[in-house]
A protein has these predicted regions:
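Predominantly extracellular beta-rich ligand-binding scaffolds that present long acidic/polar faces
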Residues: 1-173, 177
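Extracellular calcium-associated, cysteine-rich motifs in secreted modular proteins
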Residues: 181-184
């Protein structure tokens, strides 16, 4: 659980850089919440190259510049994660060019994903406002009610590190249930 941290540089919660494609860094089943990058990028996570982020909850983080939830350089994989209620100047949820699969990207301050390349790959993910890619779902800005919504158990009311205590598990009836890609 990485929470309530701040950095005067990059990576408010964590700054991670893998070595190469044969020695990837892994962040697995972690909560990265309520962190702040005060002058640079990556409020929750700053990912250099060759990092896998799997099964994580990245919520209520803030960056002054790029990537409120995640700033991703190159050759990064984000799989089975919730990226929710983050804020920044550019790319409130994700900024960069990662490969994103089976994620819920919702409720971030303005832009859910700010891609820095035309080769960005987002697939089998539920994204507020939609995102072009195979198997993606266009989520409503509302958590419940009319439209296609994520139906989180208890989301925070606001975005950024001033809000905490959300329960980001999805309930029965969520538009995201059984919509991801199964491996194997």
């Amino acid at each position: 659980y990485v929470h309530d941290n701040s950095s005067r540089g990059i990576g408010g919660g964590m700054y991670v850089d893998g070595h190469n494609s044969n020695r990837r860094a892994n962040i697995i089943n972690s909560r990265i919440e309520n962190n702040v990058s005060l002058s640079e990028s990556g409020g929750g996570l700053y990912l250099g190259s060759y990092v896998n982020v799997v099964g994580c909850n990245i919520a209520n983080n803030k960056s002054i510049s790029y990537g409120g939830g995640i700033y991703a350089s190159s050759n990064n994989n984000i799989i089975n994660c919730n990226i929710v209620k983050n804020t920044s100047a550019f790319g409130d949820g994700i900024y960069g060019n990662p490969t994103v699969t089976n994620c819920i990207i919702w409720g971030n301050d303005d832009s859910q994903i700010y891609s820095t390349s035309s080769t960005s790959s987002v697939t089998y993910s539920a994204v507020q406002g939609g995102y072009v890619g195979t198997g993606n779902i266009n989520l409503s800005a509302l958590n419940t009610g009319e439209g296609i919504h994520p139906k989180f158990t208890n989301p925070t009311e606001g975005v950024g590190p001033d809000y905490s205590g959300g329960d980001w598990t999805i309930q029965d009836g969520s538009a995201a249930i059984n919509k991801g890609k199964t491996e194997g």
